[in-house]
Amino acid sequence: MIENEEFKNLNDHWRNTIEKLSIYKDISEQTLERCDESFIETKKKICQDFDTIINYLTDRKIELLQQLGEELEAHKQQIESNRDKSMMLIEQLNKKMNSPSKFDININSSGGGGSGGVVFSGGGGGGLSHSTSYSGNLSNYLSASSGFASSPLNYSTSSLMVTNNNNNNPMTSPLKKSTSFQTDYLQVLKESISYIEWDWKDEFQENNTTNRKIIKQPKPISSMASDLILNSSFKSFDDLNKKFQEFSNNNDDTDDYDNNNNNNNDNKDDFDNCENNNNGDSLKMKSNKKLKIFGKLKFKIIETLEYKRLNSNLEDTKCIYSIGGKCKDGFDQYSIEKFDFKQGLWRSLQSIPSIMDNDFTGNFDGKNHIYLFGGSLQPTRILKYNLLEDQWEIIETNNNNNNNNNGANGANGNIEIPDNGRFLHCSVFDGKQNIYLIGGFPRSTSILKFNIITEQFSKQQSKSTTSSRNLWSMGAIYKEDNNSIYLIGGCNITRQSVDTLERYDIDNDSFTTLSPLPVSCYGAGVFYDDQEHYIYVLGGYNSKENKCLSIIQRYDLLDNSWSVLTNNHDDDDDDDGDSGGGLQNLLLPKPMMINGNSIIFDSSKRIVHILGGYNNVTKESIDDIYTLDISNILDENLSNKINWEVNKIPQFKNSKFKGGTSILVQK
């Protein structure tokens, strides 16, 4: 009996041991499978990450090479176009010189050289040959011994006059497309000849990332794991634990095992995060991987030494282009006028071919084109004006990210400016290839970047700390040395003027809040004096006092501080346009809203021009043009009285005020 009992106990012990060994075997097999799966999963992640990065770098390489090619092609096209114009002019002038009975050509130069013909130091009279004009005439012309080099070559119509038998002077009539080359024969000479040089940085950008979509491939599963997961009762480690728990309830000596495996639930995610299809043969995970953008490609335009020497013998040209604006009779004006500082008169040019109202912005690309963006009547419209040809064209883009369909379509059904367009916004040109559109209606929350080479839009990702992108009628200044945009004042959704000043860092795509304005305003005129590192804010509207301002606020970029300039001279005119200081702060001719589009700063002369304005309180329209030399503004308490000159630049040919845009072009 005792032997049977001992045998039974022995059998129970063996049975217990066998069950434990079976569990041990199962755990070993499962652990081996886990090791394999961990290896396979890690290997897959490594391969996926490298494949993702390699694919991204491949796409990035294609993107950068495409950018490189587009920039080169656009630059070459401009040079080739100007070269072709020069060839055409050479042919025209040769024909005119060979037809003295029909045309009289007079070149007047203070440096001498005869009359009745075109004289170059490298050759005698007669026509210019294209085949020798560069290799022969140019080399001689640029040589130090050239007698002609000492005398400026006057490109304007005062030095090169084409007179037919009817003695019609093109200077007395408005410039038209058909006569543009008759009146400015040598204007093409002021188009710079420059080469393009790229700056390539082969590093990942710290503050600029992109999201890449990762679709993980089916996870390789061994026959053991497949049988365990799909065909057996063990659907997960929880099932294995459950079986062991049932056994351990009757066996006290299994506590150590149970306590050492409390983390098995962590592996449940390996299965819960998977998508198992009906066939049970595919497991996929989907996710995005954030990668730092690799590489940064910038370019700069460098004027050739040969052209610099040629240009040194040409007179500088300086013109103001006034586009649009509202007339006193209440109608919108779609004309464009050009004021030539040398000639001292306004000339009518080709009218705007599209209704844009007055709430658009305009930017000069530094070469030969002016771009107009938006407007309340056509908020998605983009126009491009060719200065040399006096021609307009409507830009139609093919952006894939334009998902709105609000009727603002181009001729081919393309929406030009994304997000329903812009008006009452601000825009700045970075001096290279991008124009940035910020703020405005319809309550725009994104910064748009327009590439003038590809003529495509993209959106910046950064968000403003003070929601300046929701404002309208802001002032905007671009500062080249730190590649930043300064956003000044503006009007919010409740029509209240704000006092915010923000700096948008383009390279880092980030905003920084700076010291606020002393007096909040919107619709002010702003400009940047790069010599003294000041930002000036002129006039504008203050909603708190419900009045237009006639003060000048100045921001010092070096110490992040503002000052309101005060005039310590008595004035006969009593005006309540200041911030509470009485007559001492009346520094503008009148309280007015100027807007960034109606103020021009000539940095070379340090002269500011205000071209018209509007007082939205008194409803007074201002069509005078005011000029001020800011070199007299030395400190906050002005030692010299500010004297604005009225209509030193004569009034417009078509009297205008409020809105539109005015652009200074210097070459």
UniProtKB/Swiss-Prot annotation:
Where in this chain does the entry annotate a coiled-coil region? 58-98
What are the boundaries of the signal sequence?
A: none
Q: Is Coiled coil tagged as a keyword?
A: yes
Q: Where are the Kelch repeats?
A: 319-366, 369-412, 434-480, 484-531, 534-582, 607-654
Q: Which UniProt keywords apply?
A: Coiled coil, Kelch repeat, Repeat
Map out region (Disordered) in residue numbers: 248-281
Q: Which SMART domains match?
A: Kelch
Pfam families, sorted: Beta-prop_ATRN-LZTR1
Q: Which protein is depicted? A: Kelch repeat-containing protein DDB_G0274267
Its source organism is Dictyostelium discoideum (Social amoeba)
